[in-house]
UniProtKB/Swiss-Prot annotation:
Name the UniProt record assigns to this protein: Chaperone protein DnaJ
Binding site for Zn(2+) 2: C163, C166, C185, C188
SMART domains the record matches: DnaJ
UniProt lineage: Bacteria, Pseudomonadati, Pseudomonadota, Gammaproteobacteria, Moraxellales
Family affiliation: Belongs to the DnaJ family.
Positions with a binding annotation for Zn(2+) 1: C146, C149, C199, C202
Physiological role: Participates actively in the response to hyperosmotic and heat shock by preventing the aggregation of stress-denatured proteins and by disaggregating proteins, also in an autonomous, DnaK-independent fashion. Unfolded proteins bind initially to DnaJ; upon interaction with the DnaJ-bound protein, DnaK hydrolyzes its bound ATP, resulting in the formation of a stable complex. GrpE releases ADP from DnaK; ATP binding to DnaK triggers the release of the substrate protein, thus completing the reaction cycle.
Subunit structure: Homodimer.
Cited Pfam families: DnaJ, DnaJ_C, DnaJ_CXXCXGXG
GO annotation, cellular component aspect: cytoplasm
Residue intervals of the J domain: 5-70
Signal peptide: none
Subcellular location as annotated: Cytoplasm
């Protein structure tokens, strides 16, 4: 274990009070706890390092010794407390019921029982399903309690006995450098129990892979990336151990008309040059049916028109968003000779009319160019 400065490990100054030390340790413990970082091999070392730093800096006596002598104060074991303290005491002081946060029980005297792993399932929804809510049936394979032994892991209840290595505590004290730390018992896996005659079907694990089908209720207003938690529907934890949770993650398929940004929906409304110039009432689709919007005379391409209350009501709110319509003026193609002649005549009338500002963006553009070279 690296002998980094304890203040540096927790990220606090040497004048930090106990509240600052506790707050810094809590943040690191939440970040690096092994139960939250099963795929990060370095997390456990960082967690232990932070715990050691907190054990010293939270004790007035040990902190004073560390400030005077540094790590040398503990070369022969932790002073005063005899052997480095109990991490359960630290957790109880900092987090209260630590098991509620990390899914495992650390209660006094009992075995250390790990909960089943959480599972993740990605479900695809249409925009309409996400906005209105729906029920979906999902199927997956995951560890579930063994039918043969009812999840006990043993042929008979009498085959489950107290672990003789940890005496039912689920933890053993291990010496690591100049600290003594509590670790899960390697013989019983932290349960405090051992099985004399394991179930032949699950080999004592209490769980077996099974295919499952569940109906999931998707609440109205979910968005891409939102998760629906199904408590206790995750991986079975084994004999006498709490199940993990199932997280159903939403993926919303792209829509051919609408895009969503928070509570608002966006869409393009294509109109002709003549409709933009003369103005027109245009019928557009919404998720609640068709509505008509007024395109004002002289509307420019890119203009945003807001239709209030035609958006989405997100989860956990009652405020419905709007539908934002972006006007897209389409330039005509494949014109006939007659149409081209008419357009040229129309253009001539624009060029010859100096009294009216009929092309505001064009006039503004050329004025800016002129200002640039003046």
């Amino acid at each position: 274990m690296s002998k980094r400065d304890f203040y540096e490990i927790l990220g606090v100054s040497k004048t930090a009070d106990n509240k600052e030390v506790k707050r810094a340790y809590r943040k690191l413990a939440m970040k690096y706890h092994p139960d939250r970082n099963s795929d990060d091999p370095d997390a456990e070392d960082k967690f232990k390092e932070a715990s050691m730093a907190y054990e010293v800096l939270s004790s007035e006596e040990k902190r004073s010794a560390y400030d005077r002598m540094g790590h040398a104060a503990f070369e022969n074991g932790m002073g005063g407390g005899g052997g480095g303290g109990n991490f359960q005491d630290i957790f109880g002081d900092i987090f209260g019921n630590f098991g509620d946060i990390f899914g495992q029980s650390r209660g006094g005297g009992g075995g250390r029982s790990r909960r089943g792993s959480d599972l993740r399932y990605v479900i695809e929804l249409t925009l309409e399903e996400a906005v209105r809510g729906c029920k979906k049936e999902i199927s997956f394979t995951a560890p579930a309690p063994c039918d043969t032994c009812d999840g006990k892991g043993a042929k008979n209840a009498s085959d489950i006995v107290t672990c003789q290595t940890c005496h039912g505590q689920g933890q053993v004290r291990m010496q690591q450098g100049f600290f003594a730390v509590q670790q899960a018992c390697p013989h019983c896996g932290g349960t405090g129990k051992q099985i004399k005659n394991p179930c032949s079907d699950c080999h004592g694990n209490g769980v077996k892979d099974k295919s499952r089908t569940l109906e999931v209720s998707i609440p109205a207003g979910v968005d891409d990336g939102d998760r629906v938690r199904l408590s206790g529907e995750g991986e079975a934890g084994g004999a006498g151990v709490q199940n993990g949770d199932l997280y159903v993650e939403v993926r919303v398929k792209p829509h051919n008309v609408f895009t969503r940004q928070g509570a608002d929906l966006y869409m393009d409304v294509p109109i002709s040059i003549t409709d933009a110039a003369l103005g027109k009432e245009v019928e557009i689709p919404t998720l609640d049916g068709k509505v008509k919007i007024k395109v004002a005379e002289g509307t420019q391409s890119g203009k945003l028109l807001r239709v209030r209350g035609r958006g989405v009501t997100p989860v956990r709110t009652t405020m419905k968003g709007d539908l934002i319509c972006r006007v897209v003026i389409e330039t005509p193609v494949n014109l006939t000779r007659e149409q081209k002649d008419l357009l040229r005549q129309f253009q001539d009338t624009l060029d010859g009319d100096s009294k009216h500002q009929q092309s505001p963006h064009k006039k503004s553009f050329f004025k800016k160019i002129g200002d640039l070279f003046d």
